[in-house]
Regions:
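Positively charged, solvent-exposed patches that mediate nucleic-acid binding
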Residues: 1-98
């Protein structure tokens, strides 16, 4: 996904997507090297997964999605805003969702 997929960046995060041929999306949240402590990584991962959970029903299916976080500024509202903007940029929303 990192080498062949579509890469989009926004302040603090990058999104990589690649079609997977399945009937559902697979989501992974990962971090740059040296990103905070384990507690910070786990909190950021939980926030990212929750934000994705709230918008995944509006997305097209059949993609592998990787969110690479490299900013230690973290809040649910910021992550939701970032994911929404990145998915719009990647044209991953269903036509009915817009």
């Amino acid at each position: 996904v990192f080498k062949k997929g579509l890469k989009l960046s926004l302040n603090g995060v990058s999104l990589f997507t690649l079609p997977n041929g399945l009937e559902y999306n697979r989501f992974l949240c990962t971090f740059r090297r040296g990103f905070g402590s384990a507690v910070m990584r786990n909190r950021s991962r939980r926030i990212s997964k929750e934000a994705y959970r709230h918008i995944k029903h509006r997305l097209k299916t059949g993609n592998d999605i990787i969110l690479l976080v490299f900013s230690e500024k973290d809040s649910y509202s910021l992550r939701l805003e970032q994911l929404t903007a990145l998915f719009l940029k990647a044209k991953m929303y269903n036509d009915e969702a817009l």
